[in-house]
Amino acid sequence: MTLRRDALQTLQLNVGRKCNQACRHCHVDAAPWRTEMMNGATAHRVADWIVEHRPPIVDITGGAPELNEHFRFLVEVGCEAGAHVIDRNNLTVIEEPGLDYLPAYLAEHEVEVIASLPCYSAENVNKQRGNGVFEKSISALRKLNAVGYGTSLPLNLVYNPLGAKLPGPQQELEADYKDVLGREFGIVFNHLYTITNQPIARFAEDLRRQGKWDEYLELLAASFNPETVAGLMCRTTLSVDYEGRLYDCDFNQMLDMRIRNGRDLFLWDVTPDTLTGRAIQTGNHCLACTAGCGSSCTGALRQ
């Protein structure tokens, strides 16, 4: 099956690998000690492209994108260009010294926050993300709620399963999250997005260490759902790394599967129209996006 790109909807900027966490499932291998970050020259070239080509959505991710010194510049350029801007936020970054301005800043610019919270129980979150992460995440969610997120501003949470299994039904999990977070912590949010763990980076290492690599790939293959193909995010998303190179998705970026035309292509080498119809690079990991109800950076593809 050859997948081809449709019209561009989402420009996803991965502005660096640095993060204040080092989660077991992270497909980016992000961590506090990573140094790969988008510099000012690249950020300005990206900004020029956004202004010229006006992508409908600018999705800023990492690592923890807020740790990049050019994060606010890119947010403001995206907003001024009329894009819907998304911040992929790990929540605990809001609790870091010097970053307590984030809730008010994001609210001021009406940025959508997509926040990762792999479970509504402290035990499971701390197991996957480290001790104290759940408590910091709850504190950050309360701060986001206090400035209007979850009511007048979009706050969506992301769920990743613990271990080598597919996510449960998205609507049921969303109802459970809303019940527990609302009842126990007074937290509100808009939607829950379920994302299937990709068999790459740290999660792949875990699978191999546990002897579950083949079993997980067999599960993904056996769960292939052809109805997910039309909505795959790689068809309408362009992934940009911290140096400006292009990929069909953030997962391909982490596997260094670059969009090429005899050489590496950078964002400033292309226009949205020149990308339409190009063949998408695929691998075994792509089965994670087509398994069961499907998976994308905005959750399940089928209900």
Give the ranges of each region predicted by the language model.
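Radical SAM enzyme [4Fe-4S]-AdoMet core and its adjacent flexible, acidic
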Residues: 114, 121-234
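C-terminal accessory regions of radical SAM enzymes
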Residues: 221-255
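Short Gly/Pro-enriched turn/cap motifs at secondary-structure boundaries
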Residues: 3, 226-229, 277-280
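Hydrophobic faces of well-ordered beta-strands that scaffold small-molecule active sites
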Residues: 9-13, 58-60, 85-87, 113-115, ...
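Canonical radical SAM enzyme core domain
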Residues: 32-45, 65-136, 161-166
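Flexible mid-to-C-terminal extensions adjoining Fe-S/redox cofactors in radical SAM and related proteins
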Residues: 245-303
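Generic structural signal for well-ordered alpha-helices
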Residues: 11, 47, 75, 103, ...
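Conserved alpha-helical substructure of the radical SAM core
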Residues: 1-62, 66-80
